[in-house]
Curated annotation (Swiss-Prot):
Keywords: Cytoplasm, Membrane, Phosphoprotein, Repeat, TPR repeat. GO terms for molecular function: peroxisome matrix targeting signal-1 binding; peroxisome targeting sequence binding; small GTPase binding. The keyword RNA-binding does not apply. The lineage of its organism: Eukaryota, Metazoa, Chordata, Craniata, Vertebrata. This is PEX5-related protein. Interacts with RAB8B. Forms an obligate 4:4 complex with HCN2. May interact with the C-terminal PTS1-type tripeptide peroxisomal targeting signal (SKL-type); the relevance of such interaction is however unclear. Interacts with HCN3. Interacts with HCN4 with a 4:4 HCN4:PEX5L stoichiometry; reduces the effects of cAMP on the voltage-dependence and rate of activation of HCN4. The modification Phosphoserine is found at residues 205, 253, 257, 261, 445, 447. GO terms for biological process: protein import into peroxisome matrix, docking.
Length: 626
């Protein structure tokens, strides 16, 4: 059911109405019989657009709705806004303070009197004028309360208040209100408001009526209403025509339909977001399950197979490996690794594993090489398989901890570092003495590391370093550097890696880890020096070349960054061409970083070449050897 009253005058001087007046309707809603939920309301702002009238000579309306409280009901009751009774300037009327711009009248208010009533003589005088008519709203409801307000214009030019009648019963009918104009006597220079009202303002101001005829005809004819007014003005009841009610009903139905459409659209969008979230959560769970799967069964026949089997489906082998039957593939792979030819090293290690799936050392070097070739996911799978075959492989544990750190699996990184201490003959007694430490032996997932777990593992490493005294264990210092990196203590991590480098100054992987920690600590210039040193030792170290390009981007050296990315891609492709490998292990991360650098250089044609993967065009553009 709808019930509403809309009348607002916007005056130039004294109360002059115009055709572009703003109408504000406060929508109040009630649920249940004989009660009203004052805490649920909908506010709507409606503005008339001048100079564009419809066929019925009604100004076109644009409407926007806003949810005042948390829930929007489907059948609102329209009630006038408290703002309609506010005066912009000083008034002699005694008004009650209003604390909200869109306050809602509650059933506890029997009367809202904002100004003194006008005199009866003035009302009758104005009533006699044909251009100024009064109107009323007749409510048909049983046992309903009635709220009436009157206002008078006095003193300085004011906004003209309105007289309204609210029926709080849910079974009500909205009927027509004509313009109710109250004119007060003026205190200065005797300017009556009736003389300042023009005929254009009377004809330009249009009424907007709302109706919701949901009751049967007997209810409409059998109801009674009372008009409780404390003003001296007389309200004339005007019965609306059936055609007008039908039109008003269409307007109300259109508003309800629009509200329902907005609600349905919101629900559809919400469902889509929830569906996307569930999809990615499921994908994440599947990826984690895949990473933990037993890749090779203990079946002896499966171990002797040379082809790719279902037991090895967690790691994606190259299907056209030219070295699949190469004798001594593992030794040849180690030779290529020393030369810095990472893509070919990967092919030889895969061939060695296909020849002997239980070769833990081949899995170890395959994982380490994949990480250096900027393929972290494949590295994690290979290192996990190595540890399944050889749980005390310390190099694999440390490399796995680094890969977990790079992929954001901080809890798993802590677990791997703790297992490194546990499997190390020199330090495993420390774990036994701290057997009660919480959370150190549980399987972890991709989430921010628990502070208690991280601190517990750091205590183990610090105690082990203290036991060593002046002797520096580079592997222990490397693990300590990773732990400090996880906790964001980059300066302490830098100290740990530098300590390890004092023992292994030619370890290019340590120089790369030092550079990454410097870069994460906002020391990109020093990081460039560390990466450069790593590349001097191992020119084919693709990961360090990629990291160097990232630091160049951070320093604003975009051309140098592009040059490093192209060099890394060229190394991967050159190795493939020499060995006639149709599908090289080229990292998508490098292409993504290359596109970022090219976009920062404002080179759209080169950016398009990067999108197409046209490496030759890019190499020629930067004068690099193919």
């Amino acid at each position: 059911m709808y019930q509403g009253h809309m009348q607002k005058s916007k005056e130039q001087g004294y109360g002059k109405l115009s055709s572009d007046e703003d109408l504000e309707i406060i929508v109040d809603q009630k649920q249940g019989k004989g009660s009203r939920a004052a805490d649920k309301a909908v506010a709507m702002v409606m503005k008339e657009i001048p100079r564009e009238e419809s066929a019925e000579e009604k100004p076109l309306l644009t409407m926007t709705s806003q949810l005042v409280n948390e829930q929007q009901e489907s059948r609102p009751l329209l009630s006038p806004s408290i703002d309609d009774f506010l005066c912009e300037t000083k008034s002699e009327a005694i008004a009650r303070p209003v604390t909200s711009n869109t306050a809602v009248l509650t059933t506890g208010l029997d009367l809202l009197d904002l100004s003194e009533p006008v005199s009866q003589t003035q009302t009758k005088a104005k009533k006699s004028e044909p251009s100024s008519k009064t109107s009323s709203l007749k409510k048909k409801a049983d046992g309903s309360d009635l709220i009436s307000t009157d206002a008078e214009q006095r003193g300085q030019p004011l906004r003209v208040p309105e007289t309204s009648s609210l029926d709080l019963d849910i079974q009500t009918q909205l009927e027509k209100w004509d313009d109710v104009k109250f004119h007060g006597d003026r205190n200065t220079k005797g300017h009556p408001m009736a003389e300042r009202k023009s005929s254009s303002s009377r004809t330009g101001s249009k009424e907007l009526l709302w109706s919701s005829e949901h009751r049967s005809q007997p209810e409409l004819s059998g109801g009674k209403s009372a008009l409780n007014s404390e003003s001296a003005s007389e309200l004339e009841l005007v019965a609306p025509t059936q055609a007008r009610l039908t039109k008003e009903h269409r307007w109300g139905s259109a508003l309800l339909s629009r509200n329902h459409s907005l609600e349905e659209e919101f629900e559809r969008a919400k469902a889509a977001v929830e569906s996307d979230t569930e999809f990615w959560d499921k994908m994440q769970a599947e990826w984690e399950e895949m990473a933990r799967r037993n890749w090779i069964s203990e079946n002896q026949e499966a171990q002797n197979q040379v082809t790719i089997s279902a037991s090895e489906k967690g790691y994606y082998f190259h299907t056209e490996n030219p070295f699949k039957d190469w004798p001594g593939a593992f030794e040849e792979g180690l030779k290529r690794l020393k030369e810095g030819d990472l893509p070919v090293t990967i092919l030889f290690m895969e061939a060695a594993i296909l020849q002997d799936p239980g070769d833990a050392e081949a899995w170890q070097f395959l994982g380490i090489t994949q990480a250096e070739n900027e393929n972290e996911q494949a590295a994690i799978v290979a290192l996990q398989r190595c540890l399944e075959l050889q749980p005390n492989n310390l190099k694999a544990l440390m490399a796995l901890a680094v890969s977990y750190t790079n992929t954001g699996h901080q809890q798993d990184a802590c677990d791997a570092l703790k297992n490194w201490i546990k499997q190390n003959p020199k330090y495993k007694y420390l774990v036994k003495s701290k057997k009660g430490s919480p959370g150190l032996t549980r399987r972890m997932s991709k989430s921010p590391v628990d502070s208690s777990v991280l601190e517990g593992v750091k205590e183990l490493y610090l105690e082990a370093a203290h036991q060593n005294g002046d002797m520096i264990d580079p592997d222990l210092q490397t693990g300590l550097g990773v732990l400090f990196h996880l906790s964001g203590e980059f300066n302490r991590a830098i100290d740990a890696f530098n300590a390890a480098l004092t023992v292994r100054p030619e370890d290019y992987s340590l120089w790369n880890r030092l550079g990454a920690t410097l870069a994460n600590g906002d020391r990109s210039e020093e990081a460039v020096e560390a990466y450069t040193r790593a590349l001097e030792i191992q020119p084919g170290f693709i990961r360090s070349r990629y990291n160097l390009g990232i630091s160049c981007i951070n320093l604003g050296a975009y051309r140098e960054a592009v040059s490093n990315f192209l060099t890394a891609l060229s190394l991967q492709r050159k190795s493939r061409n020499q060995q006639q490998v149709p599908h090289p292990a080229i990292s998508g991360n490098i292409w993504a970083a290359l596109r970022i650098a090219l976009s920062l250089m404002d080179q759209p044609e080169l950016f398009q070449a990067a999108n197409l993967g046209d490496l030759d065009v890019l190499l020629r553009a930067f004068n690099l050897d193919p």
